[in-house]
Amino acid sequence: VYKIKNKNKKIEELVNMFKLQEVLKQKAKTLSGGWQRKLSIAISLINNPKILFLDEPTLGLDVIARRELWSVIEQLKGKITIILTTHYMEEAESLSDRVGIMSKGNLIEVGTPQELISKVGANNFEEAFVKIATGGKE
């Protein structure tokens, strides 16, 4: 935080983006899982990274906290590159410009959700994922 130009402005921007005003005076360890997740992502953005890695950022969050985090991720799209891992197909489809599907540690397919649906003749993204991940052997 010491070498950040306009650090107070940046902190205020992140507090507003993540709606952290109501928990500013609390210690991080006393926050719920959702608030802790939002705080950790906000902290990771303080130095204006070009790439942000999010490993299952909504795991264990309730529906409302998950949607709030999705909203923040949507706000970040186009400003930085986000690499996000998830087991939730709805999340991958909703938040991603491009999706990479991995199986047994190997990247086996990359494309937009719609490209992947079309490629395997699926009715929806989850069906496309299953067909690709299993090699068509459901």
Residue ranges and their predicted role:
Residues N48:
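Conserved catalytic motifs of ABC-family nucleotide-binding domains
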Residues N6-V23:
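Conserved ABC ATPase "signature" region
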Residues K79-H87:
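Conserved H-loop
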